[in-house]
Design a protein with these regions (language model features):
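Well-ordered alpha-helical scaffold segments within catalytic/enzyme domains
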Residues: 1-5, 40-55, 161-180, 228-238
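Extended, well-ordered alpha-helical scaffold segments
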Residues: 4-15, 55-75, 166, 177-196, ...
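Extended glycan-interaction surfaces of carbohydrate-active proteins
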Residues: 8-28, 84-157, 191-274
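Aromatic/His-enriched, Gly/Pro-containing loop or helix-boundary segments
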Residues: 18-63
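Sec-exported extracytoplasmic/periplasmic mature domains
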Residues: 20, 50, 72, 76-79, ...
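Aromatic- and histidine-enriched alpha-helix N-cap/loop-to-helix transition segments
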Residues: 32-43, 62-66, 154-166, 220-224, ...
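Extracytoplasmic mature domains of secreted/periplasmic and thylakoid-lumen proteins
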Residues: 34, 67-87
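Long, repeat-rich segments with strong aromatic
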Residues: 152-179, 185, 191-194, 273-274
Length: 274
């Protein structure tokens, strides 16, 4: 927005600091440091630098290192000791968390049990399992029906679409800085796009849907995040046409709802009507 260019730089610098200090961008400082959020930082860096009148390459190199480090937080299954985002589909990631057992039990007792009408007297191990999935949702839309309460069992459309764009941005940044020609990153992005299409595209629905790798099926809940492959430009023309054709399922008087409408009561933060 006009007049907010300096604030944009401040926001990017804040995220650089977070990544340098913690190895990732937390959901919030302090209480939210046991999970991250859907990655947009890489695109923020490129957007800011492209519009900056003074091209500070020293700053860009520092920003590039932070973008690469955050990318590895999401994708490095061997070296990431903070959080496990691996899935059975090599090359596609999931949301997660790195909270401790005591915090998860407390989260179940104080938040989830009342909100979702869950049983009080269940083993601590079950509380930890349920709370872990729900806490992982904080890395995306917070509580939402897309994952059936099993967030870490799904390969999400939004996360992997954004990681595709990170690979494109990292290639661009390396070309700007003279590190490489960026082709290796282009190949990574192309590979990810092919995997997203293979596992997350539903020809039956004409939409991109989160993929349940445990039960080997798509989520039964359609979400407006289906547009993200269009936004980043890797959806085919045929896919784009079908998605646009199906977008009315998200229409509401106030704009687009996050998830398709359901006959079930809305207990999530982002169900239909949100």
């Amino acid at each position: 927005r006009q007049g907010f260019f300096e604030q944009a730089r401040n926001n990017v610098d804040n995220f650089i600091y977070e990544v340098e200090k913690l190895g990732f961008i937390p959901n919030a400082n302090g209480w939210g440091e046991d999970r991250s959020m859907t990655p947009y930082f890489g695109m923020m860096v490129s957007s800011y630098y492209d519009k900056a009148q003074e091209k500070d390459t020293a700053w860009l190199r520092r920003a590039y290192n932070a973008v690469l480090k955050e990318y590895e937080f999401w994708t490095n299954t061997n070296g990431n000791t903070i959080e496990d985002h691996s899935t059975p589909v090599e090359g596609l990631q999931r949301y997660g968390h790195h909270s401790d057992s005591a915090t998860l039990v407390s989260f179940y007792d104080k938040v989830l049990q009342g909100r979702f009408h869950l049983e009080k007297n269940v083993p601590a191990s079950e509380k930890i399992r349920i709370a872990g999935h729900r806490l992982a949702e904080a890395e995306t839309m917070d509580f939402n029906p897309r994952f059936e309460g099993r967030c870490m069992d799904f390969i999400p459309v939004d996360l992997n679409s954004n990681l595709y764009q990170y690979e494109k941005e990292l290639g661009r940044l390396e070309r700007k800085l003279g590190i490489s020609d960026g082709r290796a990153w282009e190949k990574r992005a192309d590979k990810r796009a092919a995997l997203i299409r293979k596992y997350l595209w539903s020809d039956r629905w004409g939409l991109y849907l989160d993929y349940d790798f445990v039960n080997k099926r798509h989520s039964p809940i359609a979400s407006v995040i289906t547009v993200m492959p269009l936004y980043w430009g890797f959806a085919s023309k045929q896919e784009a046409a079908r998605i646009v054709e199906n977008l009315p399922m998200f229409d509401s008087p106030g704009g687009l709802v996050v998830c398709e409408r359901s006959e079930q009561p809305i207990l999530d933060q982002w169900g239909d009507g949100a």
